């Protein structure tokens, strides 16, 4: 079974680590963040759910890249969040530096991992990770469509007062410039 590292213990990263653990499809999940105590706390919360939800995935939190050694898959969610009034393009310079540093540290400790970038703006961050990694292009890719589509379906479900399970929608955009519906439906 695989070892997966999730870099960034914010909402998206912590949720990713939690879901991976609950699915019980990997041996170990490492949740890494520059705020090591936060990563440790969220990882501990997830690990302590194991006896109740009956999974065996090990979950650890850290701020030390050495703990990511041997990762088969790395999910990068790290970056500054978008604040009100900011576009995703406003994040480019800062988040590109973060993603570059993260990627360089990851490849120092893991041989030929698959890197999945979630940080925004996704297209630019994926390129930054690819260039910093030195890996083959088949090893680095970005994932945004599922998350953005899920958010869109949730917005529509709320606006229409129905279950999100009843909404079928797919967004096919490189970037979404909305954070909430712009008008009621």
Predicted regions and their residues:
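Single conserved hydrophobic/aromatic residue that forms the stacking wall/gate
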Residues: 176-185
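Glycine-rich Rossmann-fold phosphate-binding loop(s) that bind the pyrophosphate
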Residues: 9-10
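N-terminal Rossmann-fold NAD(P) dinucleotide-binding loop
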Residues: 13-14
């Amino acid at each position: 079974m695989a070892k997966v590292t999730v870099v960034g213990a914010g909402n998206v990263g912590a949720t990713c680590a939690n879901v991976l653990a609950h699915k019980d499809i990997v041996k170990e999940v490492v949740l890494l963040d520059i705020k090591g105590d936060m990563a440790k706390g969220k990882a501990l919360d997830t690990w302590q759910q194991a006896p109740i939800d009956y999974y065996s995935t090990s979950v650890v939190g850290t701020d030390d890249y050495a703990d990511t050694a041997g990762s088969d898959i790395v999910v990068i969610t790290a970056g500054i969040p978008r604040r009100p009034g900011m576009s995703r393009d406003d994040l480019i310079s800062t988040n590109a530096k973060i993603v570059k540093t993260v990627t360089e540290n990851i490849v120092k400790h893991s041989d030929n991992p698959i890197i999945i970038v979630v940080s925004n703006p996704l297209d630019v961050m994926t390129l930054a990770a690819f260039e910093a990694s030195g890996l083959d292009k088949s090893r680095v890719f970005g994932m945004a469509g599922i998350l953005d589509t899920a958010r869109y379906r949730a917005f529509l479900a709320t606006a229409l007062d129905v279950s999100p399970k009843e909404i079928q929608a797919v967004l096919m955009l490189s970037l979404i410039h909305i954070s909430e519906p712009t008008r009621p439906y």
